[in-house]
Amino acid sequence: MKIATKFLGEVEIANQDILTFEHGLLGLEEERKFVLLPIDADLPLALLQSVQHVEIGFVVAYPFAFKKDYSFDISEEDREQLQIEKQEDVLAYAIVTMKETFQDSTINLLAPVILNIAKKRGKQIVLQDNKAFPLRYPMQPLEGSAK
């Protein structure tokens, strides 16, 4: 099926690519169907786009590429909601606040978006140790691994 996106125009997606966020995203609790679209193969960035609303789309970054010591635990409750069975099925992204220049942009390390790629489920979680990682972390030149 074709969907209109906020940043990439019209794209073709398959039903099996749709991610379900049972509780939506923070502030968008009613928005539950998203798709993850690549932006540039050379950058650890993607577009998390609502399937239903063109105006709801977020640039997301692979946070470990920008902060190599970024780490957190996923609670048992979140693991159950996401139906996580194997660690290799899990991907984490951070929502990007885009500014005029890439260097002025920030990523939200406080509330990562966790995806279970195998089960096509997602959830944005708020880290309990909220002093460890900021809401607006500067997007420095890549310091970690993008893989």
From Swiss-Prot:
It is found in: Cytoplasm. The lineage of its organism: Bacteria, Bacillati, Bacillota, Bacilli, Bacillales. GO terms for biological process: bacterial-type flagellum assembly; regulation of translation. The keyword Cytoplasm applies. This is Flagellar assembly factor FliW. It comes from the Bacteria. Belongs to the FliW family. Interacts with translational regulator CsrA and flagellin(s). The keyword Chaperone applies. NCBIfam families: PRK13285.1-1. Pfam families: FliW (PF02623). Keywords: Bacterial flagellum biogenesis, Chaperone, Cytoplasm, Translation regulation. One of its GO terms (cellular component) is cytoplasm. InterPro entries: Flagellar_assembly_factor_FliW, Flagellar_assmbl_FliW_dom_sf. Acts as an anti-CsrA protein, binds CsrA and prevents it from repressing translation of its target genes, one of which is flagellin. Binds to flagellin and participates in the assembly of the flagellum.
